[in-house]
Amino acid sequence: MTMEKQVPIVTFRTRVRDESISGPNPYRWEDKTTDDYFSGKRVILFSLPGAFTPICSTFQLPDFESLYVEFKKNGIDDIYCLSVNDAFVMNAWGKSQGLKNVKLIPDGSGEFTRKMGMLVAKDNLGFGLRSWRYAAVINNGVVEGWFEEEGFGDNCATDPYGVSSPQNILKCLKAPAFV
């Protein structure tokens, strides 16, 4: 569960709301780096196979959102959800979920996921390359806690979920032995 690994340096292509743009799509491109997300703070990063998928949309993302205040009370500055989806998909998913606290990171090309060693094929589901489900506690860009679902591998027939749940991570954060 504990490890000392620096997160890879990656640039993410994001879409951010811009009030100066009128019309139905008032967003502009903005590059954000891993430093923008992880430097100088202690965060939770959780990664999942895809936006709008059942476990991700029914349990994992909503539960992180609802437990946000509890995470803040336990020393977490921000919570990020990452998926190998583009910025348009991630923005639409966030809007459909009514997010107020959890921030979404689009890893459209899968570069971050690949450099973390978590890129898997999900061709059996028609997804292509996606992230294996995991979560991490990251302190100033260094992974200090690791929560990876069992069964890592290409075209896994199941979608394990539990180890990377917000409830499990919160329990670990509250434990005296956690870093």
From Swiss-Prot:
Q: Does the keyword Oxidoreductase apply?
A: yes
Identify the Pfam families for this entry.
Redoxin
The Thioredoxin domain, residue ranges: 2-152
> Could you list the residue ranges forming a coiled coil in this record?
none
Question: Which cysteines does the record link by disulfide bonds?
Answer: none
> Could you say which enzyme class this protein belongs to?
oxidoreductase
Q: Which PROSITE patterns match?
A: THIOREDOXIN_2
Q: What residues sit in the active site? A: C56
Q: Which InterPro entries match?
A: PRX5-like (IPR037944), Redoxin (IPR013740), Thioredoxin-like_sf (IPR036249), Thioredoxin_domain (IPR013766)
One Gene Ontology BP term is: cell redox homeostasis
- GO function terms (MF aspect): thioredoxin peroxidase activity
Instruction: Indicate the secretion signal residues.
Output: none
Q: What is its EC number?
A: 1.11.1.27
Q: Which GO terms describe its cellular component?
A: cytoplasm
Give a short account of what the protein does: Thiol-specific peroxidase that catalyzes the reduction of hydrogen peroxide and organic hydroperoxides to water and alcohols, respectively. Plays a role in cell protection against oxidative stress by detoxifying peroxides.
- Please report which protein family the annotation says this sequence is part of: Belongs to the peroxiredoxin family. Prx5 subfamily.
- What assembly does the database describe for this protein? Monomer.
Which miscellaneous remark does the UniProt record hold? The active site is a conserved redox-active cysteine residue, the peroxidatic cysteine (C(P)), which makes the nucleophilic attack on the peroxide substrate. The peroxide oxidizes the C(P)-SH to cysteine sulfenic acid (C(P)-SOH), which then reacts with another cysteine residue, the resolving cysteine (C(R)), to form a disulfide bridge. The disulfide is subsequently reduced by an appropriate electron donor to complete the catalytic cycle. In this 1-Cys peroxiredoxin, no C(R) is present and C(P) instead forms a disulfide with a cysteine from another protein or with a small thiol molecule.
This chain's protein is named Peroxiredoxin
Record lineage? Bacteria, Pseudomonadati, Pseudomonadota, Alphaproteobacteria, Hyphomicrobiales
